[in-house]
Each structure stands twice: as structure tokens, then as C-alpha cells.
Curated annotation (Swiss-Prot):
InterPro entries registered for this protein in UniProt: UppP
Gene coding for it: uppP
PANTHER family assigned to the protein according to its UniProt record, in alphabetical order: UNDECAPRENYL-DIPHOSPHATASE
Pfam families membership: BacA
Protein name according to UniProt: Undecaprenyl-diphosphatase
Segments traversing the membrane: 3-23, 41-61, 78-98, 107-127, 148-167, 184-204, 213-233, 248-268
Reaction catalysis annotation: di-trans,octa-cis-undecaprenyl diphosphate + H2O = di-trans,octa-cis-undecaprenyl phosphate + phosphate + H(+)
Record's subcellular location: Cell membrane
């Protein structure tokens, strides 16, 4: 029962943070430390429940996704959409495959997460102040291949735990001339292949070794993350049409500084 409660908590954390620019991985690491949810299963669990969150995006955009898949002839709207998503997916996929083992062994710690949270917060503030009002693209369908590649390169930053995939791609979109809303929507679509790939890699490494209780915990986390993420996606895009990203940046700064203090006092290791 204790494991299932922890899975429920982690599912809520994943769903709340996956599509906000505050780092789901960073929060999962931090919360996992506090509730003593760590180890090999926890590491895989944290990646696999992302599938629940990404399915929330698939469900939310189901009409647009199904419409795009009906016509994938070269030159069609559907083909162009997924080609641009594929181009943006490549940089993080390649570098992630080459570095994932090192990242898992050396960078999954509260201190590194804190540094990434703070660095990402500063970048968000600077980029929004510099490029936030200069956008020329207010619809993700108008993004071209070069801009897709720029967003994909920006996504590489998210390989560092605590940086946030959502924050990285939204910042990349703003640098490419997209509005915050268009950048966020592109980020949601880019999350589909990116997170499916990360989940598949994790499954191949350790899925068969799970016990019945661990399977149950995974199901609880999956369902919880799906429902929570669906709520967040529904509210986040409308929020971006009226508000700034800075509240998320300030939150990141506060959490990052707090984590450094907790690590310094050896309350969290």
C-alpha cells in the first residue's frame, strides 16, 4: 500500500509539471528524495509515467492529430507537420542516446537539479524580455524546417535534469520568432515522439524485472499522471495568451535556491 501511495503522489507531480516550464524530472527527483522513492524501479517509473502525461496531449489534440494522419502525402499539411516535428526530434534523440547512461549515473541529484532550475529561470527571464514581444509566428503550422531544427537544438538542454523539456523548447521557439503560445503548442507536439522514445528506452532496459506490486504502482502512476496532465494542458495554453512566463521562472529560482540550502545543510543528499 505504501508503494501505491507513493506512486499516486509521483503521478500527480508528473502530471502537474510535465508541460509546465518547471522541470518534471527535477521535481520527481526532489519529491522522490523526500518520500524515499528511489532506486532502479523509481528511475524507470519516473520515465514510464511520462507516457501517461504524453497520452494526455494525444487525447487533447486528438482531432488535429487524426486529421494530420489522414493525409501524409509529401507536401500535404499532415506530412509537413510531422516532418517538422521529426526534424526537431533528431538532436535530442541522437545526443540522448549517446549520453543517457552518463546522465543517469552522474546528473540525477538534487544539487544538479537546483543548478539547472536556476540557470533555466534566468534564461527564461532574459529570453522573454528580449524576444517575447518580437514574435512573427503565432501559429505552429507556420513554423519552417530551420525553425524546427532550432527548437530541436534547444531541446537538447532538457537532457540535463532540472532544465525542463517544456522550458527548453518554448525558449527555443521564442528565439525562432514564435509567440509563447505557438511555441508551447509546438512543444506539446514535439513531446509525443520525444517522450515515447524515452519511455521505450526505459522499458527495454528494465520492464521485465518488475514484481506484481510494481506493476500495480506503475498503473496507479500512469493513470494519475494522465488525468493530472490533461487538466494542466487544458489550462496552460489559455494562460499563455494572457500572462507571462516569469511566474514560472521565479518559482524555479525559489525552488533552486531552497534545494541548494537543503543540500548544504545535508537535509537532502
Amino acid at each position: 500500500m505504501e508503494l501505491l501511495i507513493k506512486a499516486f503522489i509521483m503521478g500527480i507531480v508528473e502530471g502537474l509539471t510535465e508541460f509546465l516550464p518547471i522541470s518534471s524530472t527535477g521535481h520527481l527527483i526532489i519529491v522522490g528524495k523526500f518520500i524515499h522513492f528511489t532506486g532502479n524501479f523509481a528511475t524507470m517509473f519516473e520515465i514510464v509515467i511520462q507516457l501517461g502525461a504524453i497520452l494526455a496531449v494525444v487525447f487533447y489534440y486528438r482531432k488535429k492529430i487524426f486529421a494530420s494522419l489522414k493525409n501524409l502525402k509529401p507536401g500535404s499539411w499532415g506530412f509537413n507537420l510531422w516532418f517538422k516535428i521529426f526534424i526537431a526530434f533528431i538532436p535530442a534523440a541522437v545526443i540522448g542516446l549517446l549520453t543517457h547512461k552518463y546522465i543517469e549515473e552522474h546528473l540525477f541529484s538534487p544539487f544538479t537539479v537546483a543548478i539547472a532550475l536556476i540557470a533555466g529561470a534566468i534564461m527564461m527571464i532574459v529570453i522573454e524580455d528580449t524576444f517575447g514581444k518580437r514574435y512573427k509566428i503565432d501559429n505552429m503550422d507556420k513554423v519552417d524546417t530551420k525553425k524546427s531544427l532550432l527548437i530541436g537544438i534547444a531541446q537538447v538542454m532538457s537532457l540535463f535534469p532540472g532544465m525542463s523539456r517544456s522550458a527548453s523548447t518554448i525558449m527555443g521557439g521564442m528565439l525562432a520568432g514564435l509567440s509563447v503560445k505557438a511555441a508551447a503548442e509546438f512543444s506539446f507536439f514535439l513531446a509525443i515522439p520525444t517522450m515515447f522514445a524515452a519511455t521505450t528506452l526505459s522499458l527495454l532496459k528494465g520492464f521485465s524485472a518488475m514484481s506484481l506490486l510494481e506493476w500495480q504502482a506503475l498503473a496507479v502512476g500512469f493513470i494519475t499522471s494522465f488525468l493530472t496532465a490533461l487538466f494542466v494542458v487544458d489550462k496552460f495554453l489559455p494562460y499563455l495568451t494572457r500572462h507571462s512566463l516569469k511566474p514560472f521562472a521565479y518559482y524555479r529560482l525559489a525552488v533552486g535556491v531552497l534545494m541548494i540550502l537543503l543540500v548544504a545543510e545535508k537535509i537532502v543528499k
